[in-house]
């Protein structure tokens, strides 16, 4: 026996295995609509594990008694005890009561014998009702006939279907019930119809009964139909050959008219394994009992089981049935999608599109689309609705989708969660569905939902209320605050009426609406409030049908600024109902629990205008215009800002007008504002006129409320300039005029201001004028070894003040010097020996051209040995000393003869020296050490008492950025070189040496006196000798001194 397909053997077992591995999927939000989940009718199986609810149907019994029944198939139910059979399945009929266990077993008399096997025949795999006053179809697709060949038997699982009367009893007088319905030949094998499994699907129309047989022809499958017209009976089957088996044609089946023909019927049958992607065949009747293929709609994903569930419904009310196809195993891993419903909209009876008009998805692992059913117009809006089961999403869910003039709405209008029903043991809720019948006779069709957990649930539809004449009127419609009283400014009148969407004229229930009125909802603070309170919100109740209208008073708030835009008074309403917190069992009337039609707007609004001087149309057409410019403190327009660190203020001049033009009336501009957005470098300092502007994240200036016709206004805004850097190229302000009056040409104005950054570095010298000397002997270059051999030292110290911000890669600060290098005949003048830079660190500067110490003479080290013989006389301070400058002989003589050598003269040849100055926040010292070339001065300037050598140094900026500049700083420097030095002042003698010398002198003087006395020096001489001595002394006094003799030579 081949593995014949069935919802039991081929689908149920793997699904039951999957159920243990499923996880609860995320809940999909959907507002509850009119299928009630609080007052339930629940039925349970008497025998657990019978799969009670595997198939369900709603049925109306009109014979013998008037009642509505819930039909449930239990294909694994125990058999009626006969001593031979254990399990056959069953069909139960359940009355509409509050009891769970009052279902009755339908009497299907079938006994087991050697020629056929009813054990495990799955009676109840298909249950269908023909509709009001119609018959009932029950199938057992695993019914097996036995062929005997001697002692051996061959079993043929051909399936069997039973038709019973409206009262679910067998009426032998009814040909529908007595006909054998044996469409499959058990004398053939599985390659023909010997394993057809008839009844896997089936149903009724008014004059036909149809069956699906997916096991026929090697499980290619087939569809059968029996049609009765008066006393004629015709059998139809699909006999077109297919290329392969295992298509499962007939797995599901629907028959109806207005599909591909206005009146003729079309058979729609699913083949979920066609080409591995599944398909739906559309078949039509042909003469001779054949069903001809008209169209095949194929699935899009392998293994999705496209075609395992189908439904027909006129979704857009165009008179043609549209097609819905389930693919419960469709998935998109990245999108967390599990299951799909394909919607094919009928193209006016010609065909269906090859691709779905709409594709609905369910959550991952939900088997969304395992069941799908047309449930009628559940909300009575004129369009058919559908239900989709997702039995493995949590405990199971049922999605309700509504039809519309555009077709099926994409979003579900209601999602019914199995968890919310509060039924212990419930699982796989939504496994089977049946609708299109109003079992509680409230004019709304209800829905029966089955499961694999031996439970079925009836969900009844609640009445839907349409709110009519929801009028909201405000008086006066144009408000003049001058006419407001202490108790009222505005009167609001609201009126309601309703009807039932099903049009039941007897439905006259007392309904109370809860409504909320809100004044100026979109503005804070609001401009109106209700007289009963200080609030702009009012909550009230409205009883229908007794109450017709209500009137409320509103007052105007104080200090209302906005008198241009209307005040909107909005109203929304709802229908509060007291429902039980938990679901209850019972069949009480749902008329007391209506719901509002969600397709209607649940709110309304009206507007109140202010009285304005804006013409007869009450619309203010303003003509705000603006001119703006950055200006200097003298009022001059600026196109470029010359920025310096000491710059503090920048002014912005703005002129605003509201004058009529040819295009605009120039009427009052209400709530006229000027908004400025400026960069963080501009900080608001002051405004003229004072108080016109306020600064927060932006600068907002109030121009007037209103800014009247022909009014003009000038604003002068002062900014403090902070944070401008070398990278700042432009300052940009954006200005925007706004008004609540009508003016649609207001555009932002962008006001750019280019920035030229002026650096403010400084240059100074420690000593602008140095003094030195020359003298001694002439020495050639070849004889010089150290810089001391060149001449007396010079030391120039320049100080560069910090410029504030570092240039980095934007440029370089450079100290340049015109250096007196040679005299006109090419002899050395001032010989540079070393340039050092001290800032953030210390380093040597080497200008290009090998101009510093080009002879590579050995530099002097401070403190090394005595000076050379040429420097034995006292040397002059080379500059930078703390004491007074030494006085030369020439200086003492007031420099009788002097010559000046300077760069730019014919006597001097100068070279250009450059040293880059690094970025530093501190003063940078540049020290230039040099030597007077002694030999040049001795040879060429020995006739001069003083030679003055003068030049200059310039600090300048070298950059390629045109917006960065700096004023060059120039200092002049010189050195006076004298031809000789004054004699050195005597050195100070220590006190103890003076005392010793005085004592020694006194001792020597005493010894001399003693010797003179011994020699008789002190004895009185004769008179003659005395005179001779005096004469001699006088002669001595007349002789000139040595100094006098020296001066007489000059």
Curated annotation (Swiss-Prot):
Residues 1014-1020 are annotated as: Interaction with HPS5. It is found in: Cell membrane; Cell projection, Invadopodium membrane; Cell projection, Filopodium membrane. InterPro entries: FG-GAP (IPR013517), Int_alpha_beta-p (IPR013519), Integrin_alpha (IPR000413), Integrin_alpha_C_CS (IPR018184), Integrin_alpha_Ig-like_1 (IPR013649), Integrin_alpha_Ig-like_2 (IPR048285), Integrin_alpha_Ig-like_3 (IPR048286), Integrin_alpha_N (IPR028994). GO terms for molecular function: integrin binding; metal ion binding; protein heterodimerization activity. Belongs to the integrin alpha chain family. Integrin alpha-3/beta-1 is a receptor for fibronectin, laminin, collagen, epiligrin, thrombospondin and CSPG4. Integrin alpha-3/beta-1 provides a docking site for FAP (seprase) at invadopodia plasma membranes in a collagen-dependent manner and hence may participate in the adhesion, formation of invadopodia and matrix degradation processes, promoting cell invasion. Alpha-3/beta-1 may mediate with LGALS3 the stimulation by CSPG4 of endothelial cells migration. This is Integrin alpha-3. The lineage of its organism: Eukaryota, Metazoa, Chordata, Craniata, Vertebrata. The gene is ITGA3.
């Amino acid at each position: 026996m081949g593995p014949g397909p069935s919802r039991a053997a081929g689908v149920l077992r793997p699904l039951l295995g999957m159920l243990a591995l499923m996880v609860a999927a995320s809940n999909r939000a959907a507002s509850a609509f009119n299928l009630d989940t609080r007052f339930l009718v629940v039925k349970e199986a008497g025998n657990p594990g019978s799969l009670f609810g595997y198939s369900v149907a709603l049925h109306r019994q009109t014979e013998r008694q008037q009642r509505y029944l819930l039909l449930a198939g239990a294909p694994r139910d125990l058999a009626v005890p006969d001593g031979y059979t254990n399990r056959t399945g069953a069909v139960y009929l359940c009355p509409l009561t509050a009891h769970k266990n009052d279902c009755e077993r339908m009497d299907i008399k079938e006994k087991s014998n050697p020629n056929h096997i009813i054990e495990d025949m799955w009676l109840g795999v298909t249950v269908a009702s023909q509709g009001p006053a119609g018959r009932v179809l029950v199938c057992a697709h695993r019914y097996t006939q036995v062929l005997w060949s001697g002692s051996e038997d061959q079993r043929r699982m051909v399936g069997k279907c039973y038709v019973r009367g409206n009262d679910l009893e067998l009426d032998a007088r009814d040909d529908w019930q007595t006909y054998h319905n044996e469409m499959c030949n058990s004398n053939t094998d599985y390659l023909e119809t010997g394993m057809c499994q008839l009844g896997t699907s089936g149903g009724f129309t008014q004059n036909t009964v149809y069956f699906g047989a997916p096991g026929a022809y090697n499980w290619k499958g087939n569809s059968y139909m029996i049609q009765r017209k008066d006393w004629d009976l015709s059998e139809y089957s699909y006999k077109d050959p297919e290329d392969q088996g295992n298509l499962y044609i007939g797995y599901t089946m629907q028959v109806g008219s207005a599909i591909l023909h206005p009146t003729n019927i079309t058979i729609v049958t699913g083949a979920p394994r066609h080409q591995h992607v599944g398909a739906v065949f559309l078949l039509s009747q042909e003469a001779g009992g054949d069903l001809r293929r008209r169209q095949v709609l194929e699935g899009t994903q392998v293994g999705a089981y496209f075609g395992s569930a189908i439904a027909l419904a006129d979704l857009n009310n165009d008179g043609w049935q549209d097609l819905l196809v389930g693919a419960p195993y469709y998935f998109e891993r990245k999108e967390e999608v599990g299951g799909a419903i394909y919607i094919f909209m009928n193209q006016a009876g010609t065909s269906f599109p090859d691709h779905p008009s709409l594709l609905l998805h369910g959550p991952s692992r939900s088997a969304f689309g395992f069941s799908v059913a047309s449930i009628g117009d559940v909300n009575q809006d004129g369009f058919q609705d559908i239900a989709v089961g997702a039995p493995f999403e949590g405990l199971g869910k049922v999605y309700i989708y509504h039809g519309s003039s555009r077709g099926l709405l994409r979003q579900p209008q209601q999602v019914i969660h199995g968890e919310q029903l509060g039924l212990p043991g419930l699982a796989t809720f939504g496994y089977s569905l049946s609708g299109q019948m109003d079992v509680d006779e409230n004019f709304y069709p209800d829905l029966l939902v089955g499961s694999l957990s031996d439970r079925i649930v009836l969900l009844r539809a609640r009445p839907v209320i349409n709110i009519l004449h929801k009028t909201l009127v405000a008086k006066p419609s144009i408000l003049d605050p001058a006419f407001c009283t202490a108790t009222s400014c505005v009167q609001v009148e609201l009126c309601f009426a309703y009807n039932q969407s099903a049009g039941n004229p007897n439905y006259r229930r007392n309904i109370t609406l809860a409504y909320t009125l809100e004044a100026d909802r979109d503005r804070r603070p609001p401009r109106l409030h209700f007289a009963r309170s200080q609030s702009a919100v009012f909550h009230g109740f409205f009883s229908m049908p007794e109450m017709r209208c209500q009137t409320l008073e509103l007052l105007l708030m104080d200090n209302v600024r906005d008198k241009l835009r209307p005040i909107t008074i909005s109203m929304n309403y709802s229908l509060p109902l007291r429902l039980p917190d938990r679901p209850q069992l019972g069949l009480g009337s749902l008329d007391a629990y209506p719901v509002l039609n969600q397709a209607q707007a649940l709110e309304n609004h009206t507007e109140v205008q202010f009285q304005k001087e804006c013409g007869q149309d009450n619309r203010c057409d303003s003509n705000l215009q603006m001119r703006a410019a950055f200006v200097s403190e003298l009022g001059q327009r600026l196109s470029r800002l010359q920025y310096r660190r000491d710059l503090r203020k920048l002014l912005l001049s703005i002129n605003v007008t509201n004058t009529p033009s040819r295009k605009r009336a120039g009427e009052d501009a209400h709530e006229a504002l000027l908004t400025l957005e400026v960069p963080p470098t501009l900080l608001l300092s002051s405004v003229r006129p004072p108080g016109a502007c306020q600064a927060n994240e932006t600068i907002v200036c109030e121009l007037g409320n209103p800014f009247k016709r022909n009014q003009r206004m000038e604003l002068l805004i002062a900014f403090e300039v902070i944070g401008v850097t070398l990278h700042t190229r432009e300052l940009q302000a954006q200005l925007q005029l706004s008004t609540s009056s009508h003016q649609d040409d207001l555009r932002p104005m962008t006001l750019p201001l280019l920035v030229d950054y002026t650096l403010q570095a400084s240059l100074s010298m420690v000593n602008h004028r140095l003094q030195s000397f020359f003298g001694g002997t002439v020495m050639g270059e070849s004889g010089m070894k150290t810089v001391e051999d060149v001449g007396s030292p010079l030391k120039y110290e320049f100080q560069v003040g910090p410029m504030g911000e570092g240039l980095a890669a934007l440029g370089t600060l450079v100290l340049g010097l015109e250096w007196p290098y040679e005299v006109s005949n090419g002899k050395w003048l001032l010989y540079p020996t070393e340039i050092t830079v001290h800032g953030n660190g210390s380093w040597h500067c080497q200008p290009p051209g090998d101009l510093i110490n080009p002879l590579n003479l050995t530099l002097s080290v401070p403190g090394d040995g005595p000076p050379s013989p040429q420097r034995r006389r006292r040397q002059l301070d080379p500059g930078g000393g703390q004491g007074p400058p030494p006085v030369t002989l020439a200086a003492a003589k007031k420099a009788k003869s002097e010559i000046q050598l300077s760069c730019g003269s014919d006597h001097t040849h100068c070279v250009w020296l450059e040293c880059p100055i690094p970025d530093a926040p501190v003063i940078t010292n540049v020290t230039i050490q040099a030597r007077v070339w002694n030999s040049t001065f001795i040879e060429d300037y020995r006739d001069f008492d003083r030679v003055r050598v003068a030049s200059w140094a310039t600090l300048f900026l070298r950059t390629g950025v045109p917006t960065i500049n700096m004023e060059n700083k120039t200092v002049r420097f010189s050195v006076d070189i004298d031809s000789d030095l004054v004699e050195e002042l005597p050195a100070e003698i220590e006190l103890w040496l003076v005392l010793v010398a005085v004592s020694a002198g006194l001792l020597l003087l005493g010894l001399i006196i003693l010797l003179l006395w011994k020699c008789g020096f002190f004895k009185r001489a004769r008179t003659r000798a005395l005179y001779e001595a005096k004469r001699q002394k006088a002669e001595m006094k007349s002789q000139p001194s040595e100094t006098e003799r020296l001066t007489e030579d000059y």
